[in-house]
Amino acid sequence: MGALDSLSEYISDYFRVTRKRRKRKVMQTVNIKVKMDCDGCERRVKNAVSSMKGVKSVEVNRKIHKVTVSGYVEPKKVLKRIERTGKKAEIWPYVPYNMVAYPYAVGTYDKKAPAGYVRKSEQSQLQLLPGAPENHYISLFSDENPNACTVM
């Protein structure tokens, strides 16, 4: 009986360790941009996403081409599921205008962006960092600089 007891303890310990290693999914909200033209497109996308395991709520805004999914899901899996419907999809590339400290960076304004949104840009986020290098182009054309370009 001693061998069976030790074997059963070994097996139970093995399964206990594998249970602890399982990655728990976290509750998150995934925003995806999907081109939708009609009620059928909207219904098809909503049904495809709502049938996924772990989805708590699905909101579709056809006016700004946005699908918001809340639940215990991974963004890549939601994106793949929407692409299976035949629609082109991408992670929501915009942020609200008032959330960006300096939205005047190159590439942030997009004609296709919904009203009140600007495109996410890495350049505008880099300017917010305290140790970010600054460009001193203005000092090149000052009167105190003897090497500055002058037109007489």
Swiss-Prot record:
Disruption phenotype: No visible phenotype. Hipp20, hipp21 and hipp22 triple mutants are cadmium sensitive. A lipid is attached at residue 149 (S-farnesyl cysteine). InterPro entries: HMA_dom, HMA_dom_sf. The modification Cysteine methyl ester is found at residue 149. Expressed in roots, shoot apical meristem, leaves and flowers. Residues 27-90 form the HMA domain. GO terms for biological process: detoxification of cadmium ion. The keyword Aminoacyl-tRNA synthetase does not apply. Its main location: membrane. Gene3D superfamilies: 3.30.70.100. One of its GO terms (cellular component) is membrane. The keyword Lipoprotein applies. It is found in: Membrane. Residues 150-152 form a propeptide. One of its GO terms (molecular function) is metal ion binding. Cd(2+) binds at residues 38, 41. Pfam families: HMA (PF00403). Signal peptide: none annotated. Keywords: Cadmium, Lipoprotein, Membrane, Metal-binding, Methylation, Prenylation. Interacts with ZHD11/HB29. Heavy-metal-binding protein. Binds cadmium. May be involved in cadmium transport and play a role in cadmium detoxification. Belongs to the HIPP family. This is Heavy metal-associated isoprenylated plant protein 20. It comes from Arabidopsis thaliana.
